[in-house]
Amino acid sequence: GGERQLDGVFRLNPGAYHAEANNGDLLAKWNVAAGSKVGSFKIYIERRNPKKIGEMELIVKSGDASSVKIPLYPVLRAMGVSDSEMQAKFGEDIYKANQKASRPNALARFHKAIENRKRSTKYAPPTSAEAAQFLRDTFDGAEVSAETMKSSLGKGFEKITGEALLLSAAKLVGISKGKVKEDDRQSLSNKRLFGAEDFVYEHLTKGA
């Protein structure tokens, strides 16, 4: 009679969810499948500070509980997104705001945040080319649900591509201007039931 039953739990499908947080921040929360190097991350758009309206940042978790904020513009460029594509999706003003907010060390900071989570004294900073390749490889190794992405961004991405990040950022711009609706993270269509066998499988296959 000491047997315990592990009930299933609903888990958010891997994908991008665009909505206002409880503190008023407008975010794209990217829920990534277990086992990816990047882990879950966010894209933030500034809409309160009048001097920084429209500036976007990629927010990734580093080794401890802290997060690292990285300007989105150099991330998109490294992922193969052109300036003209950003102009078309963001509009001229927001495109220029993000180009201006770019920092030359952005990709190196992404590399350090992900690759040095254990705070090793042996960490070696990458070259610019290495940092850009690391960014591409890291996102390419992150899986998302094609169904969720189709619902959220209109295209069934299975990996995180430059286009997926561009469309996600563009959706934030649209929401910030009141032209696009937020996503409903609580919708059951964005969740799946996760049972005991799923936890075991995840542990065995992902090394979680």
Give names to the regions the model predicted.
Residues 2-208:
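N-terminal non-catalytic structural scaffold regions of very large proteins
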